[in-house]
Amino acid sequence: MLVTTASAADAPTVTSVKEHQSAKKVIVTVATKYFKIDAKDVGKANKAGKGHEHFAMDKGKYDYPKYSGANGKLAVKLGVQGKYSPSVTNKVTYTGLPKGKHTVTVYLVHNDHSNYANASAHKTITFTVK
């Protein structure tokens, strides 16, 4: 089901994705505009400008409980492990990622887990674990 907003100018948008490394953790945080996380309605009817986020680390390779913790456990519960880590916050913490180059894509999604259709509703960054 596709939910549209009033205009393209106020479409849900990922404005930035940043990573911060500390010890063996990589914290990926997201900033958005025209989008509100709607944790209580995940899996319910879609609402324009609301939903949650999907984080896909290396195309899902590290989206399991071992690496993405509680978000990985939720991925298992939803049957999407190895595809993405769902989140009802603006961040996911990954632990134990191997050293080297990694790519994470963040998607803004509706309550039913479908992606928002506008191009600004997802963003990808690449970083190196040292």
PLM regions with names:
Residues 15-16, 41-43:
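Short secondary-structure capping/turn segments at boundaries of alpha-helices and beta-strands
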